[in-house]
């Protein structure tokens, strides 16, 4: 099992040889997802970590006041809040999300993301 003083987040993704891993991720090196991208004033920055024809894992950095307009999720998805605070609008209801928290979308779920403060998140998206 896993035991920690402050809790743990465990995510497992099977990476096949046909998957494309971002070259910034080095085998055998420790890294923090939240530190892969900087914040940029007035902008949203994103970077694919790994993807294939069935899934995508992306890290995004939102400057305060930026956001994504409402759209339908192209597949099932999980958001991992990495830093700061954001607002996830899902099916007409707002949900505040902070670093260490997660949120799930169903395929087709209408959602938007707003950064009430600077906000970094990772997104695991199925593409089937």
Describe the function of each predicted region.
Residues 7-54, 89:
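A short, N-terminal "cap"/entry segment at the start of jelly-roll beta-barrel domains
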Residues 62-65, 100, 108:
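Tight coil/turn sites that cap or link beta-strands
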Residues 85-87, 94, 110, 120:
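Structural motif
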Residues 61, 74-87:
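Short, conserved beta-strand element in jelly-roll/cupin
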Residues 43, 56-73:
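Conserved short histidine dyad/triad with adjacent acidic residue
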Residues 107-128:
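Ligand-binding loop in jelly-roll beta-barrel domains
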Residues 92-106:
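Short acidic-glycine-tyrosine-enriched beta hairpin
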Residues 82-83, 98-99, 117:
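A cytosolic small-molecule/anion-sensing beta-strand core signal
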């Amino acid at each position: 099992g896993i035991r920690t003083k402050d809790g743990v987040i465990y995510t497992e993704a099977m990476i096949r040889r046909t998957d494309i891993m971002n070259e910034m991720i080095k085998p055998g090196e420790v890294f923090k997802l939240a530190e892969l991208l900087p914040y940029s004033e007035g902008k949203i920055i994103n970077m694919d970590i790994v993807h294939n024809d069935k899934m995508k894992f992306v890290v995004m950095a939102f400057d305060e006041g930026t956001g994504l307009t409402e759209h339908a999720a192209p597949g099932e998805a999980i958001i991992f809040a990495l830093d700061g605070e954001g607002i996830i609008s899902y099916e007409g209801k707002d949900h505040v999300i902070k670093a260490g928290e997660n949120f799930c979308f169903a395929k087709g779920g209408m959602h938007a993301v707003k950064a009430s403060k600077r906000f970094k998140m990772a997104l695991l998206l199925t593409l089937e």
